[in-house]
């Protein structure tokens, strides 16, 4: 049973996203505005096929679209009006499946209302999308089976939940081994104060419940995930003086991370990997995270954990693997857990620069996430 404070937060969030907000124009901060740039062509085409009401009622940050999705089973946490679900529906194809879950009934009803429309629009024989009304901290209660998904995504939603660890534990349970949680969310530069947490507007707009970014790695390790791998990061500017006074020195960043669930096997050691190319939208270059970019046909030395992720995930057939003897190549140390605020600052210095294709997050330094 949810604690009284948790239950109150759930009620406030449902009211905010179900009744207060009618379109994205009603947001009082810029923390969850969808960016207009940085979207690759194949995703842009898929987005153009989504009904305009579904898009207008969607409040996520950026586009959360990982790579290599053909035939995958994907779960979208906090699917809202279903925008991302309908984009992904086209990318996984008729043999894949998308499940969206959201605790705001009004949003789920919007998503369901256009199920037949999108099935026909995409040229599918039967729908490959299912929408569920439920809480993302209680996936089993919603009927979601253990080890049944290749990928779980979330778009600016986990911050709205009081118990982040409970959400990530549920995600770990429903992922197959080799699967990943690929998600965009808002993170704080320090522990968020009680004044910020208790502010209903700041919570509803993705700031009040933001996790201190270093805590993500602690929670992930406790549950069993590999260390978080940062993909993109962009500074959030609020643009509301009254709310900025409440926030004080606390800064916020939107960041896309990927967390992998790997089988408990002995590490195989460092490897040289060669990307075979051919992944849709990433035929010549795969930007895997902030540390590793793989170009078609080019050998890259990777640490044992990165090698294990590539070997055990849906990317296994996209790479050639060659073991590296310690005596032949000196280890190249990379900091796996990157600071999203530093990456955002580095990215800002390199303007003009957009988020890597298909990776989610936002484009450049914006008044949004």
Curated annotation (Swiss-Prot):
One of its GO terms (molecular function) is S-adenosylmethionine-dependent methyltransferase activity. GO terms for cellular component: cytosol. The modification Phosphoserine is found at residue 46. Keywords: Cytoplasm, Methyltransferase, Phosphoprotein, S-adenosyl-L-methionine, Transferase. Its main location: cytoplasm. GO terms for biological process: arsonoacetate metabolic process; methylation; response to arsenic-containing substance; toxin metabolic process. It catalyses: arsenic triglutathione + [thioredoxin]-dithiol + S-adenosyl-L-methionine + 2 H2O = methylarsonous acid + [thioredoxin]-disulfide + 3 glutathione + S-adenosyl-L-homocysteine + H(+); arsenic triglutathione + 2 [thioredoxin]-dithiol + 2 S-adenosyl-L-methionine + H2O = dimethylarsinous acid + 2 [thioredoxin]-disulfide + 3 glutathione + 2 S-adenosyl-L-homocysteine + 2 H(+); arsenic triglutathione + 3 [thioredoxin]-dithiol + 3 S-adenosyl-L-methionine = trimethylarsine + 3 [thioredoxin]-disulfide + 3 glutathione + 3 S-adenosyl-L-homocysteine + 3 H(+). It is an enzyme of class 2 (transferase). Its EC number is 2.1.1.137. Coiled coil: none annotated. It holds the Pfam family Methyltransf_31. It is found in: Cytoplasm, Cytosol. PANTHER family: ARSENITE METHYLTRANSFERASE. Belongs to the methyltransferase superfamily. Arsenite methyltransferase family. Catalyzes the transfer of a methyl group from AdoMet to trivalent arsenicals producing methylated and dimethylated arsenicals. It methylates arsenite to form methylarsonate, Me-AsO(3)H(2), which is reduced by methylarsonate reductase to methylarsonite, Me-As(OH)2. Methylarsonite is also a substrate and it is converted into the much less toxic compound dimethylarsinate (cacodylate), Me(2)As(O)-OH. This is Arsenite methyltransferase. It comes from Rattus norvegicus. The lineage of its organism: Eukaryota, Metazoa, Chordata, Craniata, Vertebrata.
């Amino acid at each position: 049973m949810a604690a009284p404070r948790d239950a109150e937060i759930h009620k406030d969030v449902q009211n905010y996203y179900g009744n207060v907000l009618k379109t994205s124009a009603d947001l009082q901060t810029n923390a969850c505005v969808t960016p207009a740039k940085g979207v690759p062509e194949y995703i842009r085409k898929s987005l153009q096929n989504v009904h305009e009401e579904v898009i207008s009622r969607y409040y996520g940050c950026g586009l959360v679209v990982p790579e290599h999705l053909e035939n995958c089973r994907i779960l979208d946490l906090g699917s809202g009006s279903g925008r991302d679900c309908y984009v992904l529906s086209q990318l996984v194809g008729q043999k894949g499946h998308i499940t969206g879950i959201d605790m705001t009934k009004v949003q789920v009803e919007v998503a369901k209302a256009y199920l037949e429309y999108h099935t026909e629009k995409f040229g599918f024989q039967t729908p490959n999308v299912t929408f569920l009304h439920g809480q993302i901290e209680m996936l089993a209660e919603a009927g979601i089976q253990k080890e049944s998904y290749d990928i779980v995504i979330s778009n600016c939603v986990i911050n709205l939940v009081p118990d982040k660890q409970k959400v990530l534990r549920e995600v770990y349970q429903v992922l197959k081994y080799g699967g990943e949680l690929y998600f965009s969310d808002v993170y704080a530069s320090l522990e968020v104060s009680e004044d910020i947490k208790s502010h209903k507007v700041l919570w509803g707009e993705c700031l009040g419940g933001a996790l201190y970014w270093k805590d993500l790695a602690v929670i992930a390790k406790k549950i069993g995930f590999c260390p978080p791998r940062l993909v993109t990061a962009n500074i959030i500017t609020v643009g509301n003086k009254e709310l900025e006074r409440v926030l004080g020195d606390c800064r916020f960043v939107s960041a896309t991370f990927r967390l992998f669930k790997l089988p408990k096997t002995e590490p195989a050691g460092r490897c040289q990997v060669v990307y075979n190319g051919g992944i849709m939208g990433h035929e010549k270059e795969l930007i895997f995270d902030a540390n590793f970019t793989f170009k078609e046909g080019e050998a890259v030395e990777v640490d044992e954990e990165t090698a294990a992720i590539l070997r055990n995930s849906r990317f296994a057939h996209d790479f050639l693997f060659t073991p590296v003897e310690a005596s032949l190549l000196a280890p190249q140390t990379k900091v796996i857990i990157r600071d999203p605020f530093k990456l955002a600052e580095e990215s800002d210095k390199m303007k003009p620069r957009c988020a890597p294709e298909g990776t989610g997050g936002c484009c450049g330094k914006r008044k949004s996430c």
